[in-house]
């Protein structure tokens, strides 16, 4: 049996599909697994041992359309469910199952605060697409695999961070997901432990501000490492503090203790850390304004008088980090 899994973006969503790959391999041993994603996210799956072929596109499925048709797939698992993935399904003469995105329910939740979403994690909803071919969930969490060049040697870190540290992920794709810079600096001061800040090049400036405010016990690694190298640093950390972003899901895949911080988005969307390490916590603001503000976190606060982050004090975050 030859199966094509389709998920184009983004990093976190792709990580959340990894149980689908695993259960296909384990429950259909002779299956040939192909995966189609965007080229810029290739590294997330590049070293996955259960993927027989990883296909990528830059923008349009026409880039690989003819080659995919030649593969004669037996089944397509569409975990993106958008116009682009529907074009893939239409190109291939194969049975397909499609993930239900529940866009209407999410719109009702963000617009009117009517929560009609099922109490079910998106991973379990991804896995339900396999029931028609006799494959079931295994309750084993997420997977993440690194290549040899992705591993960051502890001896390559600044002195003081080589024997253990707290990882704080300050990055995030949208502003409504970002715990404020000054509050993050206060968390660093309160925990009194070595801290490595993780994020992309766009987060370097905020990281520098945190180091300036919190002192030499904080190392700003934002933009210094690739995504996979950042995952390697997560692997070496004692605990991970993170916004709702791709590295949060990678940390859960590594079974780290994850302290996840939620602002404009909410765990009820079904995207919380999936089966992370023991002692993980979800922290949300206690505030008068109504969350969620948007599905993606690209909208923040309706009322200028309210700032939801005022309802999540640094002392609360620090206490979660220091908890046994």
What are these regions (language model features)?
Residues 1-324:
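Catalytic machinery of carbohydrate-active enzymes
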